[in-house]
Amino acid sequence: MLISINAYIPFARPLVYATYRDKLTELVPYMSKVRQIQLKSSQKQDGLLYLVHDWYGGANVPALARAFLSEDLLNWTEESIWNNSEYTTSWHIKTHVFTEAVHCTGKNHFLEDDKGTLIQSRGELIIDPQQIKGTPQQLTVAIARIVENSLGKQIPPNFQQMSQGVCHYLKKEQEIAN
């Protein structure tokens, strides 16, 4: 499944890029499906910034329902490489369930657009049914389709909500500064 999402934010590219890169944990209040984002590591090397974040989903899942769901179904790890000179980030998402079966990777381009920033997110989500362990062979293809459809339906709205969150965050910061 190909991922192709665009978002426009009416702020300058350097500010938008830095907000996505440096303020991710502060954007949680703007994302209804995320409970927490935790920075696990940050390393600069050869002009690139390598970040690892753990995402904790399920914010809109009632606590009672969460008690019956595995936390692994709601959480994931994102590894990203930020290239400041090109205003890009390459990302790789590792699910905590069916980790070997799920391949989700892509790249975001932050482009100057009029007086704002156009973010183009391109990637792919692939589920390999042969890597789904512990289920009867007949079910693995169906499980792969369900997982791919579920994740595929979550990625675009989460990206759009995060972009809207960046916009709200920057407007709030602008109001405080004025």
Show which residues each predicted segment covers.
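A conserved amphipathic terminal alpha-helix motif
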Residues: 136-178
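A short, hydrophobic/aromatic-rich structural module that often spans a beta strand
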Residues: 1-7, 13, 97-112, 169-178
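Hydrophobic ligand-binding cavity/cleft-lining segments
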Residues: 1-64
